[in-house]
């Protein structure tokens, strides 16, 4: 028995270690969540923008059939009707083509998968034509029957782990992942996505499922499809949605042995800092000292589709596209700092927190409109197309694994640091100018500041920085400038 247990433990360990690898193509980093985009539009974006600008991955909205809800809110996609690949974003053929096209240009696909639950009452028909009866827990499109669900009960006490994991989240019919038939169906669904070439999954509502059940499901998944450029034996990267701000019965540490987690404390803390509630000087020990999970277990972000709307965690401290100067600074810091696996949010604009994506007719999702300066219109925000963000993805790629060096701060809200001898950033969140001679760590030369502009041939469309033979440079960041950050790196040398 002891031997059998040891073998099981070793097997889980092997599974776990593989599941922390993002499976990114070499020389790339950073993923973007193209929230509610259509598959055909994502494929084109991989080819036209994400690939050429060094992005490593794209997180996509749920790919499986969901309940059609009145006024088509964004959250209808988190109400599954079946595992057929038919949504407002497109069908299976379009999704498969998207994954293939993105992989071909070095951009990996990560699917937001929902298998904690099925649709709540009122979700009687789906985007793929299936019908269901959530009130009787009948979902013939899978098929699931009442035998596959936990008994109906509500979650109202987050200090009771049994209730959080066995009862229904806001009325969503709660699947029993300990049931072998449910496990079979979930594995079948995820394996099908692996066959199509995806690199990993964001597991929605992982906190509401038992870690032991998830370990079984993850452990049964097939290895990634080598036809799509993955190394033989590669496992899907798994990032689990576990909101753990402390003080509840369930901790992210119960899940970090199985895969990475969505580190909501990062979002909350970075928001407080760049909103001026904490000083930038305190960022000197950014990382686990702030209560975050280990770096390779942390998917980090400034905001996500939930908390930008006040759902999830972080409340009013969360930064969004609606406060662009601070948002760009926080995003630049996240991308400049080596901690965690960063994910950039790409939103549609909203005034109502239930509002769905832009449509052509109230139902069919509209494609983003691209402007000459790379930005989007037509109701899409496209933060990933803001120069201050996509140029920092290139910065992250340029500095690689080089460590933070040459930390400087003014004892308040002005900081700077280098990433070895390959990149340098400075931030000013004070209400007075930053004007100092700082050690950049970089070789002598003239560099293009990739925040105010971009390198174009041998010139720069923004500010330039002259680094002396001693590595020092005069750094000026006016408090009233559009951007409170400056960044230079070896690939932006003129």
Curated annotation (Swiss-Prot):
The active site is at 204 (nucleophile), 241 (proton donor). Disulfide bonds join 46-102, 153-167, 376-382, 448-460. The keyword GTP-binding does not apply. GO terms for biological process: carbohydrate metabolic process. Binds 1 Ca(2+) ion per subunit. InterPro entries: A-amylase/branching_C (IPR006048), A-amylase_C (IPR031319), Alpha_amylase (IPR006046), Glyco_hydro_13_cat_dom (IPR006047), Glyco_hydro_b (IPR013780), Glycoside_hydrolase_SF (IPR017853). Residues 1-18 form the signal peptide. Chloride binds at residues 202, 304, 343. GO terms for molecular function: alpha-amylase activity; metal ion binding. CDD domains: AmyAc_bac_euk_AmyA. Gene3D superfamilies: Glycosidases, Golgi alpha-mannosidase II. Its EC number is 3.2.1.1. Monomer. This is Alpha-amylase B.
């Amino acid at each position: 028995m002891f031997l059998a247990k040891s073998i099981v433990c070793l097997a889980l360990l092997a599974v776990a270690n593989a599941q922390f690898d993002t499976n990114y193509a070499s020389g790339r980093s950073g993923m973007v969540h193209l929230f509610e985009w259509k598959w055909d539009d994502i494929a084109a974006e991989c080819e036209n923008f994400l690939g050429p600008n060094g992005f490593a991955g794209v997180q996509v909205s749920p790919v499986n059939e969901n309940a059609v809800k009145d006024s088509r809110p964004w959250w209808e996609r988190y109400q599954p009707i079946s595992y057929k690949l038919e949504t407002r974003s497109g069908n299976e053929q379009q999704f498969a083509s998207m994954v293939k096209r993105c992989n071909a240009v070095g951009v990996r696909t990560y699917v937001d998968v929902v298998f904690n639950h099925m649709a709540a009452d009122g979700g009687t028909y789906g985007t793929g034509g299936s019908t269901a009866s959530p009130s009787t827990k009948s979902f013939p499109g899978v098929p699931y029957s009442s035998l596959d669900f936990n008994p109906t009960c509500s979650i109202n006490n987050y200090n009771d782990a049994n209730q959080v994991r066995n009862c229904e989240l806001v009325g969503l019919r709660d699947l029993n992942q300990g049931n072998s038939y449910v496990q079979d169906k979930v594995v079948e669904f995820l394996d099908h996505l692996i066959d199509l070439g995806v690199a990993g999954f964001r597991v929605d509502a992982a906190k509401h499922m038992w870690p032991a059940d998830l370990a079984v499901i993850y452990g049964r998944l097939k290895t990634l499809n080598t036809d799509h450029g993955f190394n033989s034996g590669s496992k899907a990267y798994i990032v689990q949605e576990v909101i753990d701000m402390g003080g509840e019965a369930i901790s992210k540490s119960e899940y970090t042995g199985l895969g990475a987690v969505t580190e909501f404390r990062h979002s909350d803390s970075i928001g407080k800092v760049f909103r001026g509630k904490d000083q930038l000087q305190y960022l000197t020990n950014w990382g686990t000292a702030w209560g975050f999970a280990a770096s390779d277990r942390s998917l980090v972000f400034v905001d996500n589709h939930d908390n930008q709307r006040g759902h999830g965690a972080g409340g009013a401290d969360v930064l969004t596209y609606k406060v662009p100067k601070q948002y760009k600074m926080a995003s630049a810091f996240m991308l400049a700092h080596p901690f965690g696996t960063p994910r950039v949010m790409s939103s549609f604009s909203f005034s109502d927190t239930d509002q769905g994506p832009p449509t052509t007719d109230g139902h069919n999702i509209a494609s983003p409109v691209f402007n000459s300066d790379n930005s989007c219109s037509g109701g899409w925000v496209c933060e990933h197309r803001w120069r201050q963000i996509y140029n920092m993805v290139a910065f992250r790629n340029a500095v690689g694994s080089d460590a933070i060096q040459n930390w400087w701060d003014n004892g308040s809200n002005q900081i700077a640091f280098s990433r070895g001898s390959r990149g340098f950033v400075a931030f000013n969140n004070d209400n007075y100018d930053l004007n100092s001679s700082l050690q950049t760590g970089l070789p002598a030369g003239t560099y293009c500041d990739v925040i105010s502009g971009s390198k174009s041939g041998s010139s720069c469309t923004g500010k330039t920085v002259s680094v002396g033979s001693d590595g020092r440079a005069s750094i000026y960041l006016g408090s009233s400038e559009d951007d409170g950050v400056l960044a230079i790196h070896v690939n932006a040398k003129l």
